[in-house]
Amino acid sequence: AKTPMWSRAEVRCTLKIASVTPLAGDPFFPPARLWQLSGIGGPDAFQVGLQCAGFVVVERTDLGDHQPIPNHLVRTLLAKAHALGARLVVTEKDAFRMGSDLARFPEVAVARACLDVDEHNARLLFDPVDELMGSAIEFYRCDDARRFCN
């Protein structure tokens, strides 16, 4: 049996910050000052991502992974961030977990991430899928497939 190409390949990609946008208003651009609030397992990686995107993280509040983000904490941190000339930012994961409570704080920004894959690694990811789809299409076009399906 032929080993699928993707099981042998080591694909390297980078998670990057694509945008930092409040619920109400325009996106923030570097070098905007941010107060990072997160309830994720890797808050250091979040900070590095923001800094690599050119943002200035002036302060951060780290909660435990999956820990709820109470409204009173958001209100307090918004005031503290404002006093420092900064904006409060959360991850997409935390924004999702905050649910409808987030709508109460339209000035909270959400950092949206994107996966950066170079052309070589994109081919490692998608060429096998293209090959598999092509084989499936050819199979269903041939007479053997019609006999198999009937």
Which residues make up each language-model segment?
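ATP-dependent carboxylate-amine ligase
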Residues: 1-150
